[in-house]
From Swiss-Prot:
NCBIfam families: lpxK. This is Tetraacyldisaccharide 4'-kinase. The lineage of its organism: Bacteria, Pseudomonadati, Pseudomonadota, Betaproteobacteria, Rhodocyclales. GO terms for cellular component: plasma membrane. Belongs to the LpxK family. Its EC number is 2.7.1.130.
Length: 341
C-alpha cells in the first residue's frame, strides 16, 4: 500500500493501552462512569421520565466511540422487518448535518444539511427517515407524517435513554474497545458489561477479543461488495478486475478508514489511502488530485461527493451479512417481547 495522503484524525494513542496518560485521566473516567450509571438508574426508577412511543422501537447502537458498522446493520434490519410484514421508519441524530430541529430526509437531500448516514439510509431503504437531536421528537414527527409505520429503528442512540425501547442491538468492533476504559481515559461511552443487557450483540471484524461471555452469544457480521458504480453517474458499473494492475486512490471519511483500505487491498488493488475525519464535509478540492487515476470511496462518502465528483470517482457499495438466526431472534422478540430476566 502506497504512502498515505490526507488528514487522518486518529483516536488518541493512549486509548489503546493503560499507560501513563490514560492513568492520569482515569479519575475523570470514574466520574464519567458514576454519572452515567446514576443517569441509567434514574431512568429505570422512573425518576427521569422516558417517552414511550405507540409503536415498537429498536435501537441499533454501540458502547464505544468511532465507527462500528451501524449504518449497514440498520439497512439490513429494515430489509428484514419489511420482509416480515412490518412498516419501519428510521430516526437518527444527523451527525455532520447543519439542520436544527427535526427534519425529514429525502433521497434527493443534501448531506450537508441532514447528515451523510441518514441520507444514505434514505437512499438504501426507501423508508421514512427523520433526523433530530431530540430523538423522541424526531420519532413523533415521523409517526405523524407516516402513520403507517409500526416500528421505529433508531440509528445509534443506545445512550439516549429518554427514548424507551423494546429491543437493543449492539454492533461491536472489538478493535475499537481499546483499553476497555470509559471516556476520557478510553474509548467507551459505557462499560463492556452494558452489552450483557442488550438483546443481540453483532460482532464486526476479526481484530481484538470480546469477553468470553459475550463472544459465545455474539453473531458475526461482514460487509460485502461485488463491484463499483460511478459516483457522478451511478448507472456506470465496473468490477474490481477493471482496477487491477493500476494504482487506485481510496478516499474515506469514516470511523475506521483503514478497514476500507484493507478491504480494497484484499481485492488485489494497489491502494493509495486518503483518510479524512469521520463525517468530513468533502469539497471538490479534496478530490482534485491524480487526474485520470481511479478514486474509490464508500457509499457514505459518495452521497456527499456526488455533486462535484470527477468521472474517475467510484463508489464501493456494500451490504451487511449477519450470522444465521439473527433475524429470527430479532423478529421473535419484537413479536413476543423480551424473555424474563
Amino acid at each position: 500500500m502506497a504512502a498515505a495522503r490526507g488528514a487522518m484524525p486518529t483516536a488518541p494513542s493512549y486509548w489503546r493501552s493503560r499507560g501513563p496518560r490514560a492513568l492520569l485521566l482515569y479519575p475523570l473516567s470514574l466520574l464519567f462512569g458514576l454519572l452515567a450509571a446514576l443517569r441509567r438508574r434514574l431512568y429505570r426508577a422512573g425518576l427521569l421520565s422516558q417517552v414511550r412511543l405507540p409503536v415498537k422501537v429498536i435501537v441499533v447502537g454501540n458502547i464505544a466511540v468511532g465507527g462500528s458498522g451501524k449504518t449497514p446493520v440498520v439497512a439490513w434490519l429494515v430489509e428484514q422487518l419489511r420482509a416480515a410484514g412490518w412498516h419501519p421508519g428510521i430516526i437518527s441524530r444527523g451527525h455532520g448535518g447543519s439542520a436544527r430541529g427535526v427534519l425529514e430526509v429525502v433521497a434527493s437531500g443534501d448531506a450537508g444539511v441532514c447528515g451523510d448516514e441518514p441520507l444514505l439510509l434514505a437512499r438504501l431503504t426507501g423508508v421514512p427517515v427523520f433526523v433530530g437531536r431530540d430523538r423522541p421528537a424526531a420519532a413523533a414527527a415521523l409517526l405523524q407524517a407516516h402513520p403507517e409505520c409500526d416500528v421505529i429503528v433508531s440509528d445509534d442512540g443506545m445512550q439516549h435513554y429518554r427514548l424507551a425501547r423494546d429491543l437493543e442491538l449492539a454492533v461491536v468492533d472489538p478493535a475499537t474497545l481499546g483499553n476497555r476504559w470509559l471516556l476520557p481515559a478510553g474509548p467507551l461511552r459505557e462499560p463492556v458489561g452494558r452489552l450483557d443487557r442488550v438483546d443481540l450483540v453483532i460482532r464486526h471484524g476479526d481484530e481484538g477479543e470480546l469477553p468470553p461471555r459475550l463472544g459465545a452469544r455474539a453473531v458475526p457480521m461482514r460487509l460485502v461488495g461485488d463491484g463499483f458504480r460511478g459516483v457522478a453517474d451511478p448507472a456506470r458499473r465496473c468490477e474490481a478486475s477493471a482496477f487491477r494492475g493500476r494504482r487506485v486512490h481510496a478516499v474515506a471519511g469514516i470511523g475506521r478508514p483503514q478497514r476500507f483500505f484493507d478491504q480494497l487491498a484484499a481485492m488485489g488493488l494497489d491502494v493509495v489511502p486518503h483518510p479524512f475525519p469521520d463525517h468530513h464535509r468533502f469539497v471538490a478540492a479534496d478530490l482534485d488530485f491524480a487526474p485520470g487515476e481511479p478514486k474509490l470511496m464508500t457509499s457514505k462518502d459518495a452521497v456527499k461527493c456526488a455533486p462535484f465528483a470527477p468521472a474517475d470517482a467510484w463508489e464501493f457499495p456494500v451490504t451487511a451479512e449477519i450470522g444465521s438466526g439473527a433475524a429470527e431472534r430479532i423478529l421473535e422478540r419484537l413479536q413476543h417481547g423480551r424473555p424474563p430476566a
